[in-house]
Design a protein with these regions (language model features):
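Structural signal for hydrophobic packing residues in well-ordered secondary-structure cores
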Residues: 17-24, 43, 96-99, 142, ...
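Nucleotide and nucleotide-moiety/phosphate-recognizing core
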Residues: 37-118, 124-148
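An N-terminal, well-structured beta->alpha segment
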Residues: 1-49, 225
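Generic, low-specificity signal for short hydrophobic/alpha-helical stretches with a mild N-terminal bias
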Residues: 2, 13-17, 21, 49, ...
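YjeF_N-associated NAD(P)HX repair module
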Residues: 2-11, 113-225
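Conserved active-site and cofactor/substrate-binding residues in soluble primary-metabolism enzymes
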Residues: 8-11, 26, 30-38, 55-58, ...
Length: 225
């Protein structure tokens, strides 16, 4: 446990999401919406949102909708939008209904910030193909990089960086800090690490044996570690 709350593993993240829905009626859609709001607050400039194909992408797409409203959205790209499903696919459709063109080409025109929503806590091997190419492009973009949960390419449990991995300036980790952010390559790649509240009930964590201080977010809904 660090000074501001326990660390959480990728397996516990998955279990918490399932338990929140099945036991407590907290839909993944709601958590994704809260995540998007928090992420957008860290993007202070024209933002390119780079999405993968999982729930991490959904968080990025939700953030894009807020950035659009705030006049800070430069563009949105998804490695393979056809693979999105569930809440992430709903976020994609919402953006398209608002007239946002979600392309399969990552462009950095007008980019002051890149929101890295390519990989989240589930990665277990080195990125390949377009995933790897996009990570390398982000690192070469010259823009400030904000990563969702962990920098893409970083193992969220061990902190070991696969090649390639995103070099973030800021990492916004959702709910609780991920174990890999504090070990091995994690501190080097993550930049500033902020923990952001997305509304996950502490009772969910308690069911998994994770003790969260009840005052974790009492002073503010995000904090730096």
């Amino acid at each position: 446990m660090n000074s501001r709350g326990p660390l959480i593993s990728s397996a516990q993240v998955k279990a918490a999401d399932a338990l929140a829905h099945e036991r407590f009626g907290i839909a993944t859609d709601w958590l994704m919406e809260a995540a998007g709001w928090q992420l957008a607050r860290f993007c202070n400039g024209g933002t390119v949102v780079a999405c993968g194909v999982g729930n991490n992408a959904g968080d990025g797409l939700a953030a894009a909708r807020h950035l659009l409203r705030w006049g800070r959205l430069a563009s949105v790209a998804c490695v393979d939008a056809g693979r999105l499903h569930g809440p992430a696919e709903k976020e994609l459709q919402a953006l398209r209904k608002l007239g946002v063109d979600v392309t399969g080409t990552l462009l950095f025109e007008g980019a002051e910030v890149v929101l890295d929503a390519i990989f989240g806590t589930g990665i277990s091997r080195a990125p390949e193909g377009n995933f790897a190419a996009w990570i390398e492009a982000i690192n070469s973009s010259g823009a400030r990089v904000v990563s969702v949960d962990v920098p893409s390419g970083l193992d969220s449990d061990t902190g070991v960086a696969y090649a390639p991995s995103v070099q973030a300036h800021t990492t916004v980790t959702l709910g609780l800090p991920k174990a890999g952010l504090t070990s091995a390559d994690g501190p080097r790649l993550a930049g500033e690490v902020w923990v952001a509240d997305i509304g996950m009930p502490f009772e969910v964590y308690a069911e998994l044996g994770i003790v969260v201080p009840p005052t974790l977010f009492s002073a503010q809904d995000r904090f730096r570690i």
